[in-house]
Each structure stands twice: as structure tokens, then as C-alpha cells.
């Protein structure tokens, strides 16, 4: 049934199109191009800021982009929606994270501001006793980004910030962050592969990927039932829940799978490509 009407298809990047430590497979890039050539609309829906999209996607023609976990929406090359955190909330949150000795980053629309500890660990030469492979991956990622700036350069009347990313190194801090931050943010933790490193996101309660795909459907003049979403983590929850068909990767969060309409193969197995084939969209 999926090939009978024009669909709007939304793809998360990390863990969905892109495996940790790998580039985007050529088969995935080809599939995205085929979907669009068949008359469907394709969108990227990512937690990343728009300035941090992978180079491998730059030659794939998109109909739109949902960036910063729903806080930044682009449609046919035009920015149609942006919302950011209040400067007071940012300053208050930074103080709490600093007191917790966390690594944290202010993800602006055009620049990313990194805390003092992030500068030492992610951009410097400091090696922690618990420098696990996941942390090494973060280091490699951030050292490739030219738009990183010391947090001291951020000012309340300067760069707008829609999202804060953080990393913790003590398990007891995970629940503490949820307790303190949940009043003002969607608090998203990613599955912990190691017991000494947790990374997460603080996203405005006024934004999520689900609300963003609803806005995109309205711009396209299609019903939400004609949307399909692919994701793997809890910042995809609202998108998977709201889409006409929500597809979760086999490598995805176990709780997210409980609300999925479909579960496809893992990102390493080109699950997106296989599911698009089963849906007769390519």
C-alpha cells in the first residue's frame, strides 16, 4: 500500500542512516535518491544542528530538514521555524552541569560552544582512566568540526541555542539530571554501552520531532497518515509515535520498539534500505 500515494519519509541520522564509527553506506545514499525519484518527499530528522550534517548527505537532494531535535525546520531550502532556549535557563543549566563536573555543549544553530572540561577531554589531549571506545568516538567526531568555540565566547544576546548536549561519568548523576532538569526539558539519555559514560540531550519542552513532522505534513498538504519515520533512540519517540508508520531499527532503544509499527534490521545491516524495499518505495 505504501507505493499508492505520495509519502513524506523522515530519517534520523545517527543509529539509523549512520552507524557509530562508520560513514553512510553507498546503498543507503542510493536508496534515498531512488525514493525521491519515485515521487516521495524525503526529510532528515536529527538531533544534530543543521551545521553538523554529515558530508555524505550533502549530495542527496532533500525536501526538508528537521534539525536540533525539532527546534529547527527547513523546507525546500528555506528556514520555516526556529525556537531556542531562554538565556536565563541556559546559564542556570550550565551552572548545574558544571557543579556536577559534566562535559556539556551548547548546540547553537550555527556554532557549538563547549565547556571547559569538554575542551580538555574532547578537544585536548587529556585521557581519562575510563576512556572507553564510546568516548573515543565522541572525541573523533568533535575534533572534525570546525564550528566549535569555547563556552566563554557564548553571550546571552548572541548565538541562539535550542539544545544542550552533556556527558556524565557517574551513574548516580543520571537520575539526578532527570529529577532536576525534567521541569524545563525533555531529558533524553542514549543507551549506555559502558557503565562509566552516559550521554544525553536537554531539549526544549516546546519542541520535538513529532511536532516537527506534523508541521512538515501541513506544509506538504498531506495527512499525517501519509508520513513514515525511521529512528532508533528516545529523541525519536514522538516522531515514531506520531507518524503514520513508525519504523524502529533493530539496534534501537528497547522501549522505543514497544511503540513501533515496524522493526527493521539494524543500521549495520542496512535496515532502512531493506524496509524501503519491503514497502515498495524503491
Feature map (PLM): residue ranges:
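Short hydrophobic/aromatic-enriched beta-strand-loop microsegments
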Residues: 62-69, 187-189, 246-251, 264-266
Amino acid at each position: 500500500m505504501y507505493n499508492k500515494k505520495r509519502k513524506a519519509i523522515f530519517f534520523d541520522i545517527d543509529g539509523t542512516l549512520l552507524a557509530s564509527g562508520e560513514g553512510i553506506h553507498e546503498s543507503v545514499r542510493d536508496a534515498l535518491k531512488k525514493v525521491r525519484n519515485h515521487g516521495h518527499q524525503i526529510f532528515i530528522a536529527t538531533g544534530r544542528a543543521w551545521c553538523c550534517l554529515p558530508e555524505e548527505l550533502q549530495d542527496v537532494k532533500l525536501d526538508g530538514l528537521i534539525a536540533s531535535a525539532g527546534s529547527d525546520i527547513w523546507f525546500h531550502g528555506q528556514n520555516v521555524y526556529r525556537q531556542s532556549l531562554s538565556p536565563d535557563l541556559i546559564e542556570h543549566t550550565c551552572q548545574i552541569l558544571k557543579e556536577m563536573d559534566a562535559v556539556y555543549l551548547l548546540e547553537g544553530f550555527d556554532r557549538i560552544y563547549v565547556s571547559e572540561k569538554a575542551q580538555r577531554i574532547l578537544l585536548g589531549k587529556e585521557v581519562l582512566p575510563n576512556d572507553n571506545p564510546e568516548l573515543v568516538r565522541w572525541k573523533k567526531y568533535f575534533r572534525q568540526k570546525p564550528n566549535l568555540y569555547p563556552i566563554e565566547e557564548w553571550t546571552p544576546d548572541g548565538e541562539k541555542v535550542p539544545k544542550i548536549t552533556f556527558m556524565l561519568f557517574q551513574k548516580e548523576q543520571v537520575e539526578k539530571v532527570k529529577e532536576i532538569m525534567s521541569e524545563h526539558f525533555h531529558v533524553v539519555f542514549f543507551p549506555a554501552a559502558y557503565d562509566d559514560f552516559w550521554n544525553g540531550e536537554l531539549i526544549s519542552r516546546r519542541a520535538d520531532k513529532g511536532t516537527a513532522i506534523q508541521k512538515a505534513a501541513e506544509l506538504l498538504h498531506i495527512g499525517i497518515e501519509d508520513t513514515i519515520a525511521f529512528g532508533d533512540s528516545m529523541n525519536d519517540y514522538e516522531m515514531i509515535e506520531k507518524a503514520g508508520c513508525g519504523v524502529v531499527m533493530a539496534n534501537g532503544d528497547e522501549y522505543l520498539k514497544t511503540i513501533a509499527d515496524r522493526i527493521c534490521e539494524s543500521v549495520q545491516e542496512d535496515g532502512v534500505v531493506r524496509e524501503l524495499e519491503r514497502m515498495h518505495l524503491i
